[in-house]
Amino acid sequence: MIHSLFIVNSGGEVFLEKHWRSVVSRSVCEYFLDAQRAAPYDVPPVIATPHYYLITVQRDTVSLVAACKQEVPPLFVIEFLHRVVDTFQDYFGDCSESVIKDNYVVVYELLDEMLDNGFPLATESNILKELIKPPNILRTIANTVTGKSNVSTTLPSGQLSAIPWRRSGVRYTNNEAYFDVIEEVDAIIDKSGSTVFAEIQGYIDCCIKLSGMPDLTLSFMNPRLFDDVSFHPCVRFKRWEAERLLSFIPPDGNFRLMSYHISSQSVVAIPIYIRHNFSIKTGEQGRLDLTIGPRNTLGRTVDKVKLELTMPRCVLNCLLTPNQGKYTFDSVSKTLSWDVGRIDVSKLPNIRGSVSITPGTTNIDANPSVNVQFQISQLAVSGLKVNRLDMYGEKYKPFKGVKYLTKAGKFQVRM
């Protein structure tokens, strides 16, 4: 299925390649790099070349490119590539070029176990950790001295179990189960402040450290909100269809329990607003005035706010005064960035000033749009609430907790 895998950095350099069925020249990545240069934020997930199909995934600062000789289900390969990145993050804490280069040996060992002759084999983190021990300082020193590797000499118990995602014999002094409900808001707001488009991409991440073989049931106050869901294999889907409950025997450690999508604009409460005034008169200086404030946040603080505007090509410079945060203007890309930070409702962040344009300009480009980033802790903008968590099969009482986070996805305000 997958012949080769290439990992490409942000500069377009292939810094790792792995071949299973046949050696594919890294020159095939030029098709991917051409597509990336043409549309950096909209690279096609599947690229057809004369001899191979390239299936790509971009995560943070690296891109994974899988080369397949025959037609394959693209989503199958895309899901596998995401599993590869998730496994690297679980093992090393990050999936960046420097981290991968520092752990080349373990990376190749993992890829050998995760794919067998081009077909996915072991992708569950708990099984992989029994096969290949995560690196640490003492183990690295010992392996250097003895010449051994991180590969285990025994077959993992989970491989023969009916529950392959959970290893046997798990024991903790403190038993705890924590859930993070994270929602990303994708929205387009028009010039008058009306919502043109809005949807929510959400997911529930878990940190489960429970002894034995617990059987958990998670219920929601309003489960009918979900338009589309995707579950970890541990979730009993028939129970969800019948009762709208998440019933599962959890993996040990960190994992993503479910992803969901909410597309009804009536449910998506836009958590911020922007008052704006941008005007340019032909051949003269223009004015810019922006104010950002919270809305529908239930008193929660809006944090990590950042605004980015791509100004018209005729703009030479911006002389602005923010009452909060700092701004920068790149005269080459015509990008204005304003790092606001936290919004104080008693004094709303504002930036205003003059904009100088090329003398004699007669044709003014369209007004810019504002791309917004933000975070709101302890708020699920959809109104989703976890009702309760019940545990069966074990007699102890675990510590339980739920955190909510709303943040901007592709959030754009037109001016």
Task: Please report, for each region that a protein language model flagged, where it lies by residue.
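Acidic, low-complexity cytosolic segments
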Residues: 1-176, 182, 188-194, 206-212, ...
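Intrinsically disordered, low-complexity Ser/Thr/Pro/Gly-rich interaction regions
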Residues: 132, 142-415
